[in-house]
């Protein structure tokens, strides 16, 4: 195939040539500036920068090479590249050997701040080291997309952090040190293990627990699994969501019971028949609970010998709102609602969310059946809603 002659591209408009340069790596794009003054000017108009130390510090045979002159050359290369820029749209920085090759935090931070000062909207950092991100990074008013990885260690986040236009955040293998004490909303998915992690989660307000067992060797795993630490750490939350698999793990692993959840005001609970004993225990341990959301009630509607067993509710409960998710409309589910209405004297609102689409006639019938149910509270209102 005939090789393309750069001179033959001189007839193309600047806008098109800039687009072509933008599709190249920064190192390739820089090399075009040697062609002529026009190409040097065109390169300065490219808004995307891709900096990667791998191409400078690694030989083709795979061995590392570090020479001070190469390090200085790399720093000068990046400094010149940034100096030629006005506005920067995308800035990507990959450094696999930040400290091994003598690149200090101050140098890299200067590059990041330089890009931020030029209004960068997409920032991609892949720095395989413990790294203190500059303060200016946490208060950017132009960042729309941010990706951090791989192996980057972020030791602190300022309380004044504000990224008002950020829409996309991608984190890959990021380590946050000593930040758990500032976490407010936590989704925790894990496999129970013999030695459970210790976390400082005093600031938590909302938690979703999604614990799972490995089905292979189930009996062996459940015998040594430990969830005591994580359950103890979340005892001060205000909102708690337990998936059905988390309830299963808790029912098997917490033989010594549950802590008291004095601050818990909202509980979303999903379970199966054989683990339904966890709910009464949790309600007993949550003296200030006001909102109870039950999902998949049809799964644990029967007790032994296929007989109805109502959910045990503490006599002094303060529940004001009761919701049923995935409601099938069965007679047994209706018995559960009837049972709960008689046990909750503070109840004000009952919301029933249907599992599947139902015609208006059936929905009306369900509403009528539930409205007729006797209740301990004279203020209760029942709402039936579609899926």
From Swiss-Prot:
Pfam family name, one: F-box
Coiled-coil intervals, chain numbering: none
Keywords: Leucine-rich repeat, Repeat
InterPro entries: F-box-like_dom_sf, F-box_dom, FBL60-like
Domain F-box as annotated: residue spans: 6-60
Disulfides per UniProt: none
Name recorded for this polypeptide: Putative F-box/LRR-repeat protein At3g44080
Matches recorded under PROSITE patterns: FBOX
LRR repeats: 9-34, 146-173, 180-211, 219-244, 271-296
